[in-house]
Structures are given as C-alpha cells and as structure tokens.
C-alpha cells in the first residue's frame, strides 16, 4: 500500500555515537587491532614541554591523515568536511557529535613546519610493518619488488634543458677490482688510474616541480613523474618498503640499497626475490649472488640488428673462455675494458671466406666482436633460476602480489597522482598510503581470526 511519511528534522533524540558505527566497520577493526600508542613517543621530541598553548592531540592529527589515505580523500579541506558529517570518522578520532573538527590548516601546518625534515612518516610505516611481523603476517623470506609511476603536479610543457653530472654507482669500486683481477688472469697489464671524470647528461628540468623527473619509457606515459619503488612480502603481501625517486631514475639504481635497508631494519632472512625485467643488470645479479639470494628476474627482450645473427647464436665455452660462432669457428679473448666488458674477436682471415659473413657482421675488417661482462656468470645463473620449476612458480606470484598492491594504491587510495610537489611531500604520500594499506590488511586478517 502506498504510504508517505511526514518527518520532522528538529526532534531531539538520545543516541550513543558507538551505536552509529557498524560492528564490522573497517575503522573499528583498525582501532581494535592496530596499536597507535607508539606515535606519541615518536612525536614528543617535536613538541615543547612547557611553552605555548596546548596542541592538538597528535593521535587525532595522524588519525585524520590515516582517514584521508584509507578512503582516498585527496584534499585536507574535503577531509575536514567529511569528518564533520561522518559519524564513523568522529568515532575513530574520539570526537563527540558536537565536538568541533580540527581545522584543515592544522594538518598542513604540522606537515610543512613541525614534521619537516623529520623521519616521522618513515617511522610510522616501519612500526606498522613491525606490528605485521609480530602478528606473524610477514615472513621476510620471499620478497617482490617493482616500481610504479605517480604523475607529478607539474605541466610537462614547462621545463628547461639542463646538463647534470651522472651519479657514480655504489658498485664501481667492486667492479674496478673485478676488472683488474680479470685482466691479471688473462695476462693483461693493469689499467692505469685515470682522473675520474663524471659523465654528464642533458635532462628536461621541470620549472614547476624541479625534483620530479621526465619519464620516457616504452609503453609508459610521457611527462614529469615520480617513482614509487615498492617491496611486498610473499606471505600476506604486506608492504615492507616504499621509496621515492624522480621519474628519470632507473628501477635498478636503488634496489640493492633498499634490500639491505629491509634486512637491517627488520632482520629479514631473505631467501628469494622476484623482479621485473628492468632489474636484469649484472650488478644486481652479482649483488643477489653475494647475498646468497635466489633471484628470479623476467626476461628482457633485446632487439638485434635486422639481418644479423643475435648474440645467443654464439655459444660461450666457459672451459676454454671463448665463443663458438654458428659456423663452428672460435672468437678468442682480446681485452677487458674499463666498463667491465671482455672483448672476444674472430679471425678476419677465416671470416673473409665464411659463407655466413653477411649474416654475422658488417664491419669493414670482416671481424666479429662479442662482448661479455665480467659478472655475466651471475646473470646467467639468474636466467637459469627463471627457467627452473621453482622460478616459474615464484614469478607467477609476482603479478598477484606486487601488481595487486599497486592497483589497490591507485584505485582505492589515490596514489595515481601526486597530491603535492617536491620529493619530501611525495614520500610522505607514498609512505602513509603504504602504511594504511598495511593497517587495513592486518586489521582485516586479525578480525577474521576472532
């Protein structure tokens, strides 16, 4: 039967705020299973003990931030409004129905002033990971790492051309030692020391956000971006590391340092890692071997010169330290250069009469040259790992773990775009997003356990 209701909006009711929040609400689970008491001790050094007016409770301040990242609320002004109307948010913050909501400028002032140049956001992220470890949700044995791009708050057409010095990689000292040892083994004189000249490169320097980097990769959007280099654990896909670089930094550059950071910070006993093809470099393969870690890295596609034999057509004979060409002739060792590459050269007299010459080389002296890195053995070991049964199973898990983590960040938590400008602000966004994802996962799991 059709019915209408005449309701009045000015009736007085006696209600408990707790009754307005569902029993299975996410914020109830987080409030019950996540211990936020550590925040008080972490932020105490940044407050005065006896000067000024009483501050906003730091727990309320950070819980407001958590709400914003949990529910993808990008604006602090909008966050203030959402808390004003949402009873679950008020309950989580410990605010009564009639209590005023802290002003949005309080959040921004604390971020820009009180917590500027501090490690508070990294500390919060680390503490949440440690809680996951305490609940046996992080194994620390098998890790997945990848990077994703965040669109910088910058116009890609507003930039200047700038020449910068390229940073020296951390592995250079080890590489130089390996080069000298390799030359000695082959009876070559040690390379003379040369004055270090830093290589330079020209980049597009954003005038809007100078710390962002111009991303130009195959199958990727073009423009100014930041990169979130993330690691997740095999067990429950808890994020164990989140590190920000500008968009023009190669994925492989920060990897080993961040791996060591996790091992030192959380005491991980890492046994295996699965990585994308961007990490298939000789230094990373060597680093994994030195750490006795089973590395599985995706195959990187190479594009050989059309009409010429690809490198894999030439077989390396490790016992004789030589290459065998498709016509069963040998390429012998020649030298090892400063970049760590050995050169193997064919006999031009034999090559001149070879029926496969046109498919082998276009050099005027009719000599084929193949290079091999001094750490290539470690790279080949990683390739063998990828083709093994355990390697194939492990790599299948990669897309289910790290890719899923990135998808949740972008679709549910607003990590597709940078909210603010500058590496420090983007790092804050990335760390708090990752921390909130971990909170949600830990709380949901523990709630199911009862």
Annotate each predicted stretch with a short phrase.
Residues 1-28:
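Hydrophobic alpha-helical membrane-insertion signals
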Residues 3-6, 65, 72-85, 95-450:
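Anion-binding and metal-coordination hotspots
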Residues 10, 23, 36, 57, ...:
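Generic alpha-helical segment signature
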């Amino acid at each position: 039967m059709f019915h209408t209701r005449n309701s009045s909006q000015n009736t007085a009711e006696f209600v408990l705020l707790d009754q307005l929040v569902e029993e299975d609400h996410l914020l109830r689970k987080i409030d019950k299973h996540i211990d936020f008491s550590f925040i008080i001790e972490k932020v105490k050094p940044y407050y005065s003990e006896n000067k000024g007016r009483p501050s906003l409770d730091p727990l309320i301040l950070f819980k407001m931030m958590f709400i914003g990242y949990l529910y993808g609320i990008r604006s602090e002004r909008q966050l203030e409004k959402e808390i004003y109307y949402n009873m679950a948010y008020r309950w989580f913050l410990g605010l009564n129905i009639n209590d005023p909501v802290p002003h949005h400028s309080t959040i921004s002032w604390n971020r820009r002033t009180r917590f500027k140049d501090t490690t508070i956001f990294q500390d919060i992220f680390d503490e949440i990971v440690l809680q996951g470890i305490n609940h046996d949700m992080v194994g620390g044995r098998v890790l997945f790492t990848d990077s994703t791009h965040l669109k910088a708050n910058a116009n890609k057409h507003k930039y200047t051309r700038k020449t910068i010095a390229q940073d020296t990689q951390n592995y250079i000292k080890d590489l130089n030692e390996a080069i000298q040892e390799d030359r000695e083994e082959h009876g070559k004189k040690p390379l003379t020391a040369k004055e270090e000249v830093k290589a330079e490169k020209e980049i597009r320097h954003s005038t809007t956000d100078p710390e962002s980097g111009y991303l130009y990769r195959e199958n990727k959007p073009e423009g100014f971006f930041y990169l979130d280099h993330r690691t997740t654990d095999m067990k429950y896909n808890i994020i164990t590391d989140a590190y920000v670089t500008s968009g023009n930094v190669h994925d492989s550059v920060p990897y080993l340092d961040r791996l060591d950071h996790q091992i030192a910070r959380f005491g991980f006993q890492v046994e295996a890692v699965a990585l994308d093809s961007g990490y298939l470099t000789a230094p990373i393969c060597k680093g994994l071997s030195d750490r006795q870690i089973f590395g599985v890295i995706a195959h990187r596609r190479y594009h050989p010169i059309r009409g010429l034999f690809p490198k894999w057509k030439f077989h390396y004979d490790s016992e004789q330290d030589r290459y065998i060409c498709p016509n069963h002739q040998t390429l012998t060792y020649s030298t090892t250069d400063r970049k760590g590459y050995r050169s193997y050269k064919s006999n031009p007299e034999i090559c001149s009469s070879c029926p496969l010459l046109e498919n082998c080389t276009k050099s005027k002296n009719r000599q084929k040259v193949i290079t091999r890195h001094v750490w290539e053995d470690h790279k080949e070991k990683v390739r063998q790992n990828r083709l093994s049964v355990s390697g194939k199973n492990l790599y299948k898990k990669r897309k289910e773990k790290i890719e899923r983590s990135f998808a949740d960040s972008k679709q549910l938590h607003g990590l597709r775009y940078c909210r603010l400008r500058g590496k420090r602000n983007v790092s804050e966004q990335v760390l708090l997003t990752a921390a909130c994802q971990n909170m949600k996962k830990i709380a949901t799991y523990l709630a199911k356990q009862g």
